[in-house]
Amino acid sequence: MKLRANRVGEQMKKELGDIISRKIKDPRVGFVTVTDVQVSGDLQIATVYISVLGDEEQKESTLKGLAKAKGFIRSEIGQRIRLRKTPEISFEFDESIGYGHRIDTLLHEINKEGKREE
């Protein structure tokens, strides 16, 4: 069953990227990248992880815009993916990109310090 949830998640990720970039006209929704979709084993709940280009204020307004368009997004997903019941969608920020950037910065600083000591 987990395999099916993963396949549905990947398909939803692809469709959500298209829906958010092309169909949503809300000016609050900025440049959004869908980084991952986690679907529960019973296919009832989908957590969508997004990355937003901009500062904290833009991120919050994008999240509000997506929350407002949640019903439209869910109906579009229901039309594009044939499931008995379309999963309930929730949006969350993907912090892994910022975390990866922080690790990259720290490694770069360590590398600089190593060169200075030589």
Swiss-Prot record:
Query: What keywords tag this UniProt record?
Result: Cytoplasm, Ribosome biogenesis
The main place the protein resides is cytoplasm
> Gene3D superfamilies recorded for this chain?
3.30.300.20
An example GO CC term for this entry is: cytosol
Q: Which GO terms describe its biological process?
A: maturation of SSU-rRNA
Coiled coil segments of this chain:
none
- Pfam families given for it? RBFA
| Sample GO molecular function, one term | ribosomal small subunit binding
Known role: One of several proteins that assist in the late maturation steps of the functional core of the 30S ribosomal subunit. Associates with free 30S ribosomal subunits (but not with 30S subunits that are part of 70S ribosomes or polysomes). Required for efficient processing of 16S rRNA. May interact with the 5'-terminal helix region of 16S rRNA.
So what family is this one in?
Belongs to the RbfA family.
* Name listed for the protein in its UniProt record: Ribosome-binding factor A
